[in-house]
Amino acid sequence: MKWTEVNVKTTNEAVEAVSSIFDGLDAVGVKIENALDFENYRASNPAELMELKDIPHITEGAIVSAYYPDDTTNIDVILSQLRTKVNALVDFGLDIGEASITTVEVQDDNWATAWKKYYHPVRITRYLTVKPSWSDYQASFSDEKVISLDPGMAFGTGTHPTTRLCLQALEMTMRGGETLYDVGTGSGVLSIAAKHLGASDVEAFDVDDIAVAAAQENFDLNPIAKDIKVSANDLLKGINRPVDTIVANILSDILVPLIPQAKQLLNSNGYFILSGIIDDKLELVIDTLIANDFKIEEVLHYGEWRGVIATNRKDD
């Protein structure tokens, strides 16, 4: 079978947003080539004998590729919508780089499985490791928690800097027994991690029905996540039950309207963990948190990305 491969040359910062755009444009599959992924893998596995030159890869930026059957009749419309949506990411403060769009004909569907050989288990934090669903990797020490994900979904693999910041913050703040909301769950990795770290009750939300389905598939891959409830919802609108922790890894401009909602739903001294914040949006997020009477406990850094740990001040 022949396919049309559509490629967007962009930045590490924009890969997840571009992937989501492709998903909304009915791509059959999405592939991400990210120069930073190779550096992260090498840094996470310093003892492994691995020559990056043996694996075809780009050395800077990222390429997000999507696949459409060659008989797709509206490919020109898709390309036009893609260009508009990618350019609009600038309005959310994302650096999209050159954002060039190219197409190429692919002769068969080997792309659908060939990428699997480049995915390996990755140690994300002190205790949390993410592995692809087909890997038979087992925990190598007693406290290691292994999360199984299907990287074929266009909602991240747990290794993006914003996800790492959230996972680190969860590990820093959770003590066991917490109730938690995961807002903008995507792959569901944060919800699964929360269960591994001792959360007693987790609910996950995403505005995208496809993300909800992807998260449910990943929950099904992890026995510890079998009781996580996931549903489509616009942030926390209509949610009434207070919880101990709220975690959100979404764009800064979406975090801002979430903050007053989180204020109403967090128990006294509960933790609010935010990520997806580029450096020049950090002040806006922190100012909004303070205006809503949150206490800033810590700001985490990973490259150009920032994460914030805040607590809901106890009423005097």
UniProtKB/Swiss-Prot annotation:
It comes from Pediococcus pentosaceus (strain ATCC 25745 / CCUG 21536 / LMG 10740 / 183-1w). The gene is prmA. One of its GO terms (biological process) is methylation. It is an enzyme of class 2 (transferase). GO terms for molecular function: protein-lysine N-methyltransferase activity. Keywords: Cytoplasm, Methyltransferase, S-adenosyl-L-methionine, Transferase. GO terms for cellular component: cytoplasm. It comes from the Bacteria. The keyword Signal does not apply. This is Ribosomal protein L11 methyltransferase. Belongs to the methyltransferase superfamily. PrmA family. It is found in: Cytoplasm. S-adenosyl-L-methionine binds at residues 163, 184, 206, 249. The lineage of its organism: Bacteria, Bacillati, Bacillota, Bacilli, Lactobacillales. It catalyses: L-lysyl-[protein] + 3 S-adenosyl-L-methionine = N(6),N(6),N(6)-trimethyl-L-lysyl-[protein] + 3 S-adenosyl-L-homocysteine + 3 H(+). It holds the Pfam family PrmA.
